[in-house]
């Protein structure tokens, strides 16, 4: 298939990056080397794929959902030994055979699957990862990135920002206007680099699970004060003890609590529960 004859499908949320400066920037921040095994999600017509394959990398494995693009991509790159292609949905495809080989993940994420993509590649609190990615480069909706990077006291602060910041180091490289895509989306995007925190440097898994529990309970009623959300799992006496031991005011709302304070709350909550 000739790429000029292909028309994007709305159901796949296809907005292809056409800004050459941003394409070059992605290659630059990836800092590719001869040992890199790259996973590219949704290569589209292969604009970024071409740039990545021009680098000194070991392998690039691309996963594309759109069957009509598979032949196009194979025709374009089938003579390149470093390239392999798999047709499938990234939300359900089995990566077990290559997951431990992958060093870097690169993707222009469809906005409608951002949450599940983050769960798969950044991970979840309380769950050990079966991979060890060095770097994840995502081009994603700016509003979501604003939420992920938000600190306590911000109206954007939420369970998502705390979970992601506990699991990875995050850096926003730049914001990307709609005009950089074809067709242009209705919103701005951001180019972001995640560096997942290695399993052996993460918090204790049981502690992560308890933090996740507190976040889920608290942010389900984010307008309520902490005292009125945690009373579903703690008595008034326990709440007072936890507030004092953690040096956290329970008249605050969950978005006003720092990551360090959430860790202290979970640690001390576990200690209090062990007394019972």
UniProtKB/Swiss-Prot annotation:
The gene is rsmA. It catalyses: adenosine(1518)/adenosine(1519) in 16S rRNA + 4 S-adenosyl-L-methionine = N(6)-dimethyladenosine(1518)/N(6)-dimethyladenosine(1519) in 16S rRNA + 4 S-adenosyl-L-homocysteine + 4 H(+). It comes from the Bacteria. InterPro entries: KsgA/Erm, rRNA_Ade_diMease-like_C, rRNA_Ade_Mease_Trfase_CS, rRNA_Ade_methylase_Trfase_N, rRNA_adenine_dimethylase, SAM-dependent_MTases_sf. S-adenosyl-L-methionine binds at residues 15, 17, 42, 64, 89, 108. It comes from Prochlorococcus marinus (strain MIT 9312). One of its GO terms (molecular function) is 16S rRNA (adenine(1518)-N(6)/adenine(1519)-N(6))-dimethyltransferase activity. This is Ribosomal RNA small subunit methyltransferase A. Specifically dimethylates two adjacent adenosines (A1518 and A1519) in the loop of a conserved hairpin near the 3'-end of 16S rRNA in the 30S particle. May play a critical role in biogenesis of 30S subunits. GO terms for cellular component: cytosol. The keyword rRNA processing applies. SUPFAM superfamilies: S-adenosyl-L-methionine-dependent methyltransferases. The keyword Repeat does not apply. It is found in: Cytoplasm. CDD domains: AdoMet_MTases. NCBIfam families: ksgA (TIGR00755). Keywords: Cytoplasm, Methyltransferase, RNA-binding, rRNA processing, S-adenosyl-L-methionine, Transferase. Pfam families: RrnaAD. Its EC number is 2.1.1.182. Belongs to the class I-like SAM-binding methyltransferase superfamily. rRNA adenine N(6)-methyltransferase family. RsmA subfamily.
């Amino acid at each position: 298939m000739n790429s000029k004859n292909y028309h994007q499908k709305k159901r796949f949320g296809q907005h292809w990056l056409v800004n050459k400066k941003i394409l070059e920037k992605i290659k630059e921040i990836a800092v590719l080397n001869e040992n890199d095994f790259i996973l590219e999600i949704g290569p589209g017509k292969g604009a970024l794929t071409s740039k990545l394959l021009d680098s000194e990398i070991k392998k690039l494995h691309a996963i594309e959902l759109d069957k009509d693009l598979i032949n196009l991509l194979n025709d374009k790159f089938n003579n390149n030994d470093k390239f392999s292609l798999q047709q499938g949905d990234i939300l359900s495809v089995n990566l077990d055979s290559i997951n431990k080989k992958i060093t870097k993940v690169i993707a222009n994420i469809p906005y409608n699957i951002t949450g599940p993509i983050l769960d798969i590649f950044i991970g979840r609190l309380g769950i050990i990862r079966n991979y060890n990615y060095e770097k994840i480069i995502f081009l994603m909706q700016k509003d979501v990135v604003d939420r992920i990077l938000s600190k306590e006291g911000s109206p954007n602060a939420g369970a998502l920002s705390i979970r992601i910041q506990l699991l990875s180091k995050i850096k926003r490289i730049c914001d990307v206007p709609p005009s950089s895509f074809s067709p242009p989306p209705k919103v701005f995007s951001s180019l972001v680099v995640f560096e997942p925190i290695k399993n052996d440097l993460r918090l204790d898994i049981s502690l992560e699970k308890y933090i996740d529990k507190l976040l889920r309970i608290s942010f389900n009623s984010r307008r309520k004060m902490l005292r009125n959300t945690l009373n579903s799992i703690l008595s008034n006496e326990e709440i007072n003890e936890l507030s004092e031991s953690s040096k956290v005011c329970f008249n605050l709302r969950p978005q006003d609590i720092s990551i360090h304070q959430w860790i202290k709350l979970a640690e001390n909550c576990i200690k209090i529960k062990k007394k019972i």
